[in-house]
Amino acid sequence: MKAVAINGYGTVGKRVADAIAQQDDMKVIGVSKTRPDFEARMALKKGYDLYVAIPERVKLFEKAGIEVAGTVDDMLDEADIVIDCTPEGIGAKNLKMYKEKGIKAIFQGGEKHEDIGLSFNSLSNYEESYGKDYTRVVSCNTTGLCRTLKPLHDSFGIKKVRAVIVRRGADPAQVSKGPINAIIPNPPKLPSHHGPDVKTVLDINIDTMAVIVPTTLMHQHNVMVEVEETPTVDDIIDVFEDTPRVILISAEDGLTSTAEIMEYAKELGRSRNDLFEIPVWRESITVVDNEIYYMQAVHQESDIVPENVDAVRAILEMEEDKYKSINKTNKAMNILQ
């Protein structure tokens, strides 16, 4: 049973902590917070040992009546590995601390690939992180792209990908972000960061462009893929049906928007209404000459969570076969495929 520390108990960290706790070969030995807020209290209610990320703030937690087990430094002493779920840019700064402590670490997609040196996606390049000291789980959008592009590449050979990414403006709890009434090219030039990020884990030719829109629910992707071997629509459906963490949805079933997909996620009865899988609209799958078209959605708060679990097994050399790790994680988390 491997001991996992979660540095940063926010949108991603709290989900990763719960996913780790569901596994039978690893456990959460502690989570960290910078502020004594409601999430800190909820962590304690869930039975997680709570550590203070900024030592100078220990007294703030004590004043708030929140019991802490120590500082992040203390937490790392108890762990085999740390999953850094801190805000963008903080993880790279924490890397020095992890190196000094001699502890292996997993970072999130907000960090730059160049700063960490290695990126991770369960299906695309699990083996590259096996036994390594540090890796970075690619971003939510990149994870979503890799989930569907990797099996297409394996099955038909990708010549080129062009993807238009419609990004949510903020997560539901981010009251300080927007836009409220605008569509923002992000950036107003090619490429968006998503294409280069895909290339850190999957060796394909890809260009991406993105816009930010005033919604908080999900991202949405419009993907065009030129392939070496032209498939039929049924061939593509078969590939997606056989791909872990990808599900086919249908507008005929009432799933015509990201809002309805999130309603579907609620009906699954999961904590926080998470959708770990990448839903692909069945009706959108089209083949014209040697080009595949399809539309998919990404629940930005949760799709990267199972990848973090697999990354633990890869780095700590707990499982060499990526499919065995994926299946083990999926079963523990009740992932649909």
UniProtKB/Swiss-Prot annotation:
Q: Major location, coarse class?
A: cytoplasm
Q: What is the catalytic activity of this protein?
A: D-glyceraldehyde 3-phosphate + phosphate + NADP(+) = (2R)-3-phospho-glyceroyl phosphate + NADPH + H(+); D-glyceraldehyde 3-phosphate + phosphate + NAD(+) = (2R)-3-phospho-glyceroyl phosphate + NADH + H(+)
Under which EC number(s) is this enzyme classified?
1.2.1.59
InterPro entries per record: DapB_N (IPR000846), GlycerAld/Erythrose_P_DH (IPR020831), GlycerAld_3-P_DH_AS (IPR020830), GlycerAld_3-P_DH_cat (IPR020829), GlycerAld_3-P_DH_NAD(P)-bd (IPR020828), Glyceraldehyde-3-P_DH_2_arc (IPR006436), NAD(P)-bd_dom_sf (IPR036291)
Q: Name one GO cellular component term.
A: cytoplasm
The alphabetical list of record keywords is: Cytoplasm, Glycolysis, NAD, NADP, Oxidoreductase
Pfam assignment, any one:
Gp_dh_C
State which pathway it belongs to: Carbohydrate degradation; glycolysis; pyruvate from D-glyceraldehyde 3-phosphate: step 1/5
Q: List positions binding D-glyceraldehyde 3-phosphate.
A: 139-141, 194-195
Which GO MF terms are attached to this record? 4-hydroxy-tetrahydrodipicolinate reductase; glyceraldehyde-3-phosphate dehydrogenase (NAD+) (phosphorylating) activity; glyceraldehyde-3-phosphate dehydrogenase (NADP+) (phosphorylating) activity; NAD binding; NADP binding
Q: Name one GO biological process term.
A: lysine biosynthetic process via diaminopimelate
Q: Where in the cell is it found?
A: Cytoplasm
Active site, per annotation: 140 (nucleophile)
Q: Does the keyword NADP apply?
A: yes
Please list the residues that bind NADP(+): 11-12, 34-35, 110, 171, 300
HAMAP family in the record, alphabetically? G3P_dehdrog_arch (MF_00559)
Family membership noted in the UniProt record: Belongs to the glyceraldehyde-3-phosphate dehydrogenase family.
What does the protein in this record do? Exhibits a dual-cofactor specificity, with a marked preference for NADP(+) over NAD(+).
Subunit comment: Homotetramer.
- Name by which UniProt lists this protein: Glyceraldehyde-3-phosphate dehydrogenase
Which organism is this entry from? Answer: Methanothermus fervidus
In the record, what lineage is assigned to the organism producing the protein? Archaea, Methanobacteriati, Methanobacteriota, Methanomada group, Methanobacteria
Q: Which gene name belongs to this protein?
A: gap
